[in-house]
Amino acid sequence: MRIATFQLRSRLADVEGNIRKADALVGKLDRMLQGNGKGKNLDLLVLPEMAFSGYNFPSLKAVRPYLEPSEAGPSARWARTVAQKLGSVVAVGYPEICPSTLQDNLSLHAKTGEDVQDERRFNSLIVVKESGETLVNYRKHHLYYTDDPWAHEGESHESGFFSMPLSTPSKQQSIPKDDSGDANVGCSPKNEIPTTVGICMDINPYKFIASYSACEFATHARTSGAKLVVLSMAWLTLLSSKELSTMTDKPDMDTFQYWISRFAPLFLPDEGGVEDSSGEVAEPQVIIVFANRAGEEEGQEGKDTARYAGSSCVVGIRRCPRKVGDDDDGNRVEILIWDMLGATEEGICLVDTDSTPRMVGSVKI
């Protein structure tokens, strides 16, 4: 697969300016695709959480002018235009507003006893395919402190699961199944990949009160059979402005290691215990796209400045199970890193997951 992320240094409440930044990166990406000798095809482009509005809004009043109608605002229009231009799937995070239903109102009133409004608001990710048709409009399920004051919870992690079409054949694409549910090895692979999407805080414990080891989102990714996990993010860093000033081309590795740790369920071997091997190098079982933003956003209404971790990357999880006859009593997991941007860099992470990764780390389990 050929995957790109745009790591933007978005300015809060500057939709037009942020779109201009993204447009400039589209032009750069188009030139990169034409100049790499592999043709223009791109499978997926991912932008950060609330890419064009910015993220660090202190209240509903502050974010309200930037709420976009479901699948119909500037973010959705941009996604459709760029998807058609690049011939790829495009995912963009945006603040969504939509009318509430009677069922919504009754449910909310039953839970809270409060008067209900005639609108619902979500921190959302729209994913569109080359034709401009919406593949999924996912709504963030685990809200963070910043979006909790204005956004409603999305339905579930499962609502972000779908089959993503691919522009080019890939080693990770789907194998059609027969009536029993087993892979039909006599059929050609479908030009699509089982995919699940999430937004930033989704990989953390629910409200930071669920068990740390529950790893709800990663568990969903595993049980759903997803081969591609896409995360649109506005992930903060603990680094100071002074520390970040030296990290234009250096990723925030503490943040990266934490991200990887939240996918521990994907490290576990498949059911069945000891596996034999043909000796060939295995393909990664899951590919994860971390599409974060960079830069700082000053707070409004007394809210603290938000500093973002950048470090967008595309990685693979490759389980290397113990083979028959091995003396080692453990299994090993390899973390394949095709590319990673710096913590403060504004730019493009473009990778081909069928190529050799730039870095490989390992974890013993």
Model feature map: region roles:
Residues 30-40, 105-106, 112-113, 166-190, ...:
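Alpha-helix termini
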Residues 7-9, 48, 56, 139, ...:
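Residue-level recognition of beta-strand->loop/alpha-helix junctions
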Residues 29-65, 83, 90-91, 202, ...:
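Active-site beta-strand/loop signature of hydrolases that rely on acidic residues for catalysis
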Residues 355-365:
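C-terminal helix/juxtamembrane-tail motif
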Residues 15, 89, 110-114, 296:
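Eukaryotic scaffold repeat domains enriched in small/polar residues
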Residues 73-91, 204-342:
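CN hydrolase (nitrilase-like) catalytic-core segments centered on the catalytic cysteine
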Residues 68-71, 81, 97-228, 232-233, ...:
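Active-site catalytic loop in hydrolytic enzyme cores
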Residues 1-44, 64:
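N-terminal glycine-/serine-/threonine-rich phosphate-binding loop
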